[in-house]
Amino acid sequence: MIELKSGLLVSKIRNGTVIDHIPAGRALAVLKILGIKGIEGYRIALVMNAESSKMGRKDILKIEDREIEEKEAELITLIAPEATINIIKDYEVVGKRKQEIPQEVVGLLRCTNPSCITNNDVEAITRFRTLKRRPLQLACEYCETRLTEDEVVRQILG
């Protein structure tokens, strides 16, 4: 539930997903990860730059009649590590999960090194290990090329 001092800003959803604690300005990137363009028929509430005692400012997404898949949650975690994913059934939170940035990211991102084997062998699957969680820094297992958080966000946004 998103509340203002004067009351409710966005109504509750009956069934679906609420993603809270998204860093301010990244909710549109989360929608892109989910492949939501606005024509799918989902009712979506998007709040950007909401006040947050924990984060200063944050974004919030409510998506009615849609649950987040594990692979989507992993990608969301890479650009919104503090995000909380709430599953809603009959207006109640029935599941709440906070993803951890994985130790290894497999097949989700591409290596930026044009000489890397993953860019020259169609069967090679990208594999990055997490070097730092904040700010995010990943290293390619094959060529050691490093990806920063900004590069990860750029790749996800395509």
From Swiss-Prot:
Superkingdom to which the source organism belongs: Archaea
Q: What is this protein called?
A: Aspartate carbamoyltransferase regulatory chain
Assembly, in brief, is:
Contains catalytic and regulatory chains.
A single Pfam family, by name?
PyrI
Q: What gene codes for this chain?
A: pyrI
Give the UniProt entry's GO cellular component terms.
Answer: aspartate carbamoyltransferase complex
> Mind listing the UniProt keywords for this protein, alphabetically?
Metal-binding, Pyrimidine biosynthesis, Zinc
Job of this protein: Involved in allosteric regulation of aspartate carbamoyltransferase.
Show the GO MF annotations: metal ion binding
Q: How is the cofactor bound?
A: Binds 1 zinc ion per subunit.
| Native species | Metallosphaera sedula (strain ATCC 51363 / DSM 5348 / JCM 9185 / NBRC 15509 / TH2)
Indicate yes or no for the key word Zinc. Answer: yes
